[in-house]
Amino acid sequence: MTQKIIKVEGMSCEHCRNAVESALAKLNGVSSAEVNLDENHVRVEYNDSKVTFENMKEAIEEQGYDVK
């Protein structure tokens, strides 16, 4: 498993947290996603042979947030 911290702009509440975590959890290969609202990032644990950073970036951006 690979772990990555992705900086995300625009998250400010529980709805934001749930939207990002749910979008990432739906991706095949993501085993966990945990948003930290104070730090504006999400920590993702995933299988890099099944899912790419670009896949995760797209899933987050589709929810209306910016990946930095």
UniProtKB/Swiss-Prot annotation:
Function: Chaperone that serves for the intracellular sequestration and transport of Cu(+). Delivers Cu(+) to the copper-exporting P-type ATPase A (CopA).
Gene: copZ
Pfam family, one: HMA
UniProt domain HMA: residue ranges: 2-68
CDD domains documented for this protein: HMA
Protein name per the record: Copper chaperone CopZ
PROSITE patterns listed in its UniProt record: HMA_1, HMA_2
GO CC entries: cytoplasm
GO terms (BP aspect): copper ion transport
Highest taxon of the lineage: Bacteria
Binding site for Cu cation: C13, C16
Subcellular location: Cytoplasm
Organism: Staphylococcus epidermidis (strain ATCC 35984 / DSM 28319 / BCRC 17069 / CCUG 31568 / BM 3577 / RP62A)
Keyword Coiled coil in annotation: no
Gene Ontology MF terms in the entry: copper ion binding
Keywords: Chaperone, Copper, Cytoplasm, Metal-binding
InterPro entries documented for this protein: CopZ (IPR049740), Cu-bd (IPR000428), Heavy-metal-associated_CS (IPR017969), HMA_Cu_ion-bd (IPR006122), HMA_dom (IPR006121), HMA_dom_sf (IPR036163)
